[in-house]
Amino acid sequence: MRITTKATLIGLLTSLMAGCDPQPAPPIASHIYINGNIITLDDSHGTVRALAIAEGKILAVGSEDDILEHRGERTRLINLEGKTLLPGFVDAHSHLSGVAIQAISANLLPAPDGPVNNIAALQQTLRDHIASSPVVAEHGVVIGFNYDDSQLEELRHPTRHDLDAVSAEIPIVALHQSGHLGAYNTRALELSGIGPDTPNPAGGIIERESDGKTPSGVLQENAHFSAIYPLIPNFTAAQYTQALKAGIAIYAANGFTTVQDGKTDPKTLNTFAALSSLGIFDLDVVAYADLAVGNQDPLLRGPLLSPSYRDRFRIGGVKLTLDGSPQGKTAWFTQPYLQPPSGQADSYAGYPAFTEAETTKWITLAYQNDWQLLVHTNGDAAIDQFLNVATTVAETYPDDDRRTVMIHGQFLRQDQMAKIAALNIFPALFPMHTFYWGDWHRDSVAGLERAENISPTGWMIEQGIKFSIHSDAPVTFPSSMRILHSAVNRTTRSGAVLGKQHQLTALHALKAMTIWPAFQHFEDQTKGSLVAGKLADLVILDKNPLTEDGMDLLSIRVLETIKEGRTIYIAPE
């Protein structure tokens, strides 16, 4: 008994002595942020007061006392002074290559983003651009971005005659804000080989003058896509690098640390691959190749098609476009447009980009190759086609975690939600439409009932479906605060609320700009929330979106954007 007692005492003393061993020092941070509202967007942490980073990753989050234990002699201590820090925004869908070209093109946007609210202003903006643009001087082509017929006083598209009045010698293309139409002057039509005898291509329309033959200058969908790409200037590497850097700077100024290029054409895809190796990307760029055009590109079968970035670039998969835009009245509906476009019958409901057989071919190709697939669908008929084909193809190529993405889903019907859930489709929605085209959708495109349910984020919350929200830049500017404001308020240009049942809380909207699009991209283990081990991708705002009045969200400023611990944007004083 004594032996046992003695042994027990020795064991106890040994345990106590072991407990006195010095604990290892906590790891040292390179940066510590204190005295701020640090919104982690991680449910287990919520909002904290301090964050430490080391080697480009988050070391710890928590109270100031706990985090300051990671302070060393060389640690940089940043006092947020009550400002707000949250994860860098993850772009759910846009077109970096388009933003790059937009940055060096004529700005044809209407107010509040540009000067063009009538045809005369459009013409003058193009004249000014011709006079000042080195791109026009060198390449002899004029590209203007993002006129919006719904906001022009004339409520029509510019014609070839309107653009010929600017110049009959230089080819001019005015791109519609939807990205799905373009207005061409006569010279641009000639260079594109489009004349009175040119038939409409499959999935596209050449609008005609009153004689029914002569092109008016307005090209829709595939007619536009086939004409525009050959007219884009053949930039030198230095020129395109400059444009690309300008585009990246716009995203960084809006707090984005990951950017998408959706439906990347083969030339641009190869250019991105080449330029990334030169280290020009300050943030992560994930490209999705044009499935219908670039499916034979060797890059889709090479090491860049990867969940990991190389020189801040990777190929995430492919994109397929099944219809057009509702604001341009080319989206494919099951019910007619409220007011059909000029020259169309009252029964006009838009049109598909592909037949069901063609769509089946493309989706099968993506699933066969295990390519993550983004599918552009705006009208409910296009969504029907997508869901029906995806259901059939998934029976042959099942995958529980494919994360096929529905891009826009603007006029998704509630009865389609069951298939969205059953197929594990990830919806990437576009609630900025409520501001830019909400009045137009209600009064001209679809009527009140359909318009109130555009980008139906409320249905997603009700059914517990993760989703993301985006800008579709250059369709709209990649304004993070406009994305947030539109998702929370759903106010139109006229100030009306469109679809109150789909208004998001600021917290849900922020998740749809960070952790949920990170999940969409298969990157939620490294991005989208502020937890230890994830990349130190951060944005600092001057005010807290969780406590600001919803209508004031647009006034919040991005002060600093940080990619893996390195500042890539800081707001001017």
Language model features with spans:
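His/Asp/Glu-enriched, well-ordered alpha-helical/loop segment
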Residues: 364-374, 381-404, 408-409, 414, ...
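Beta-rich accessory regions
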Residues: 564-566, 572
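Divalent metal-binding segments
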Residues: 21-35, 39, 43-301, 307, ...
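Bacterial N-terminal signal peptides that target proteins for export
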Residues: 1-9
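C-terminal motif of bacterial Sec signal peptides marking the signal peptidase cleavage site
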Residues: 16-19
